[in-house]
Amino acid sequence: RRGTAYSLLLQRVFTRRNFQSNCTPKLMPQANSYRIGHSPDPDDAFMFHAMTTGAINTGERSYEHVLLDIETLNKHAMNGDYEVSAVSIHSFPEISDKYHLMNCGASMGEGYGPMIISNREISLEDAKNLVFAIPGVGTSAYLALRLAMGDVKFEVVPFDDIMPAVQRGDYDVGVIIHEGQLTWKDEGVNLILDLGIWWNEKTGLPLPLGGNVVRKDLGMITCREITKDV
C-alpha cells in the first residue's frame, strides 16, 4: 500500500473537477466512449488516470471517470449501468451474468485488509455485541467481517465517514477500508482486528477485496481491448 504522503499528492493531482460524481448514471456515451466507475481512493484514480487523459494510446476508445463509493458502484453494477467498473469481489457473483471480471487491477489483501476499529479498548469478544458501522453489505469488508465474527448487528455508513463516526461515538466499532487502513494510527482509534491478517493466518491465502469488470454486451473483442487498456 502507498504511504499517506503519496496518497495526499495523488488527491491534489486528480482533483474532483476531472470526475463525474453524480450518483445517477448519465445518458449512454457516444460510440467508442466508455464510463469507468471507480472509488475516490487515490490508487483507483492513479490506475485509470492515464486512460482518460491520453497518456497512453487507447486507439479510438475514450474514457471518462465516474467517481462513486464502492457500495454505490456495486449497486450500479447490479443494473449494468456502467461499461467498466470497480466492484467488490463479494458482489461479483450477483453481476456475473452482466460483466466479465478483468484479469488486471484487482485488490488482493496480502498481510492487510479491512480493519475493525473502536474508539476505546474493546476485546474481540465484547465487540460482537456492539453495532458495527460498515461500508455496505455488498462489500468484501462486510463478507470478511461475517466470516470472522459471524452474525453481528450493523448499520451501513459511507466508507469515508466510518472513522469520524467512531471517533464521535456514534458507533463503538467500525470496519474501515481504503485510506483509513493507512491513517488509523494517526486518528487515535484502536485496532481490534485486521481482517486481512486474520484471513491470511486462517487460510494462507490473500484476501480478495475488489476487482474491475467490463460489461458483456460490449462484445468480446471490445471487452478484450478495454481490458488491455486497463
For each feature predicted by the language model, list its residue ranges:
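Short loop/helix-cap segments at secondary-structure boundaries that form the rim of catalytic
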Residues: 94-96, 145, 183-186
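Intrinsically disordered, low-complexity segments enriched in serine/threonine/proline/glycine
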Residues: 6-8, 21-22
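Active-site regions of enzymes building and remodeling cell-envelope glycoconjugates
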Residues: 99-103, 152-154, 189-192
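Hydrophobic/proline-rich hinge and linker segments of small-molecule sensing/allosteric domains
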Residues: 101-124, 199-217
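A structural signal for short, well-ordered beta-strand segments and their strand-loop junctions
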Residues: 77, 86, 156, 174-176
